[in-house]
Amino acid sequence: MLAKHCLEEFKLDCQLRRLTDRTIKGYYNNTLNFLIYAEKHHGITEVEEVYTLHIKHYVQYLLSKKLTAAYTNNILKCLRAYFRFAIQEEYI
């Protein structure tokens, strides 16, 4: 499944779980930024193409931007939620 289509389903799932608009926006934007990075740097468009190594490269990229640890951890929390959803829905 296209990673961006999975993201749209993830957003809908978050809305159905009645998460706040702010939380949904954060999950969506942080995950979208990762997907854009993955496509640009690794040519990844399908959710099942993402491996742990790609996420590690993304973390390394975030660290190179001198972001705070709290902000970086928040991004990782969003990615964990997205991939947990993808596994739950058996897209991965």
Can you say where each PLM-predicted feature lies in the sequence?
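N-terminal core-binding DNA-recognition domain of tyrosine recombinases/integrases
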Residues: 4, 8-25, 29-92
